[in-house]
Design a protein with these regions (language model features):
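DNA breakage-rejoining catalytic core of tyrosine-based enzymes
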Residues: 1-22, 79-91, 106-107
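Basic, Lys/Arg- and aromatic-enriched nucleic-acid-binding interface segment
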Residues: 2, 13-47, 200-201
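Short, basic (Lys/Arg/His-rich) helix/loop patches that form interaction surfaces
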Residues: 29-30, 125-169, 176, 188
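Catalytic-site neighborhood detector that most strongly recognizes the C-terminal catalytic loop/helix
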Residues: 171-196
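Conserved tyrosine-mediated DNA breakage-rejoining catalytic core shared by Y-recombinases
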Residues: 53-96
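A short, glycine-centered helix-capping/turn motif at helix boundaries
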Residues: 40-54, 159-162
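Active-site/catalytic core of tyrosine-dependent DNA strand-transfer enzymes
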Residues: 90-140
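Phosphate-coordinating loops and pocket residues in cytosolic domains that bind phosphorylated ligands
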Residues: 25, 53-54, 61, 181-184
Length: 205
């Protein structure tokens, strides 16, 4: 079930990886470009305003890191003009985008997504509405494009325990105070894992 915080004027939502899969599939039924847009936000942590722009020319494999990185020009959380960062792309998303570019006959500099920011946001709302209707799950109606980045940050910082400096770099945050509002409480699975590990370490002393 989608986790929500409706204690503030703007409801915040956090999707699990499985729920993100559902959203991608729902969006993909209305067009491959929609699915790609959601992958870039939910799997790579892009803001809705950053989705249109990146292309094959921006994607590179880092031999040092053994990972895919791609250049994103986006918000500067310190203020001022936009800045470029290297965002991380999971292998599965890179594979999908290579296939997408081939089948769409995209040139290296052709953006994967050409839709406006408002259109990208609408795609998320439409896919979430489809799931809410099909599953009789009203919480999905509150899901927005920003919640995909929120879910991405929580999944890696809270659930996977990725270090903050790494997340600041690939997510485009200038300091931890800019990330903290994105985070949700750990899931029960994460709490259980943490407490079991702590208990095991205590017993071994």
């Amino acid at each position: 079930m989608v986790r929500i915080d409706d204690s503030q004027p703007v409801t915040k939502c956090w999707l699990s990886p499985t729920e993100l899969d559902q959203l991608e599939r729902a969006a993909g039924k209305d067009g491959w470009e929609r699915e790609v847009a959601i992958q870039l936000m939910g799997r790579c942590g892009l803001r809705a305003s950053e989705v249109a722009g990146p292309s094959d020319a921006d994607l590179r494999y880092s031999d040092d890191g053994d990972i895919w990185l791609f250049a994103v020009r986006g918000k500067n959380t310190k203020g001022g003009g936009k800045q470029t960062r290297d965002a991380w792309m999971p292998d599965a998303v890179a594979d999908d985008l290579h296939k997408y570019s081939r089948e769409r006959n995209l040139d290296r500099t052709d953006p994967w997504v050409t839709a406006s920011t408002d259109t990208v946001r609408r795609w998320v709302k439409e896919a979430a509405h489809t799931i809410a209707t099909q599953q009789d799950a009203p919480r999905w109606e509150a899901v927005s494009s920003h919640d995909l980045r929120r879910s991405w940050a929580t999944q890696h910082l809270v659930e996977r325990q990725v270090d903050v400096r790494t997340m600041m770099s690939i997510g485009g945050w200038s300091d931890y105070s800019a990330i903290e509002p994105y985070l949700a409480a750990p899931t029960e699975a994460r709490i259980g894992e943490a407490m079991r590990n702590n208990t095991s370490q205590s017993n071994s002393v």
